[in-house]
């Protein structure tokens, strides 16, 4: 059994989940829809992108841009691209009566190659 720490005081810092931030990610869609039947591949890819954004940004309200939807569906329902570069933007919700203060907007970033790309913070411009 692990020994108990004495004086277990935690620093009370600000949660990073409440900050407005934008990051670019590469999502491996192929591994997320592996084994899914043909007629459900593109819809499942959209659900998996939504799930990924929810996990990374910590907001239950995720909005997917129409250009990203078109990019997923570009080759049909069964031939979804293997990887996608997306920009996740955590933003403040302007709607006062919404239960969530923040939402995540997922937009498509077209790239020629995925080699050497890493997750990067994008400054708000």
UniProtKB/Swiss-Prot annotation:
The molecular function GO annotations come to:
structural constituent of ribosome
What the entry lists under Gene3D superfamilies is as follows: 3.10.440.10
List, in alphabetical order, the GO biological process terms annotated in this UniProt record.
cytoplasmic translation
A Pfam family found in this protein is Ribosomal_L31e
**Which cellular compartments is it found in?**
Cytoplasm
Keywords in alphabetical order:
Cytoplasm, Ribonucleoprotein, Ribosomal protein
Q: Establish whether keyword Repeat is in the entry.
A: no
Q: Name one GO cellular component term.
A: cytosolic large ribosomal subunit
PANTHER family assigned to the protein according to its UniProt record, in alphabetical order: 60S RIBOSOMAL PROTEIN L31
Sequence similarity: Belongs to the eukaryotic ribosomal protein eL31 family.
Q: How does it assemble?
A: Component of the large ribosomal subunit.
Described by its record, this protein's role is as follows: Component of the large ribosomal subunit. The ribosome is a large ribonucleoprotein complex responsible for the synthesis of proteins in the cell.
Protein name, as recorded: Large ribosomal subunit protein eL31
The scientific name of the source species is Ictalurus punctatus
| Gene (UniProt) | rpl31
């Amino acid at each position: 059994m692990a020994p108990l720490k004495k004086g277990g005081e935690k620093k009370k810092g600000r949660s990073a989940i409440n900050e407005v931030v934008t990051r670019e990610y590469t999502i491996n869609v192929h591994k997320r829809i592996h084994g899914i039947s043909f007629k459900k591949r593109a819809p499942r890819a959209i659900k998996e992108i939504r799930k990924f954004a929810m996990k990374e940004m910590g907001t239950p309200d995720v909005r997917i841009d129409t250009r990203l939807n078109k990019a997923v569906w570009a080759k049909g329902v069964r031939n979804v691209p293997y990887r996608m570069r997306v920009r996740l933007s955590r933003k403040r919700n302007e709607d006062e009566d919404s239960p969530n203060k923040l939402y995540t907007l997922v937009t498509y970033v077209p790239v020629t190659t995925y080699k050497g790309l890493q997750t990067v913070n994008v400054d708000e411009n």
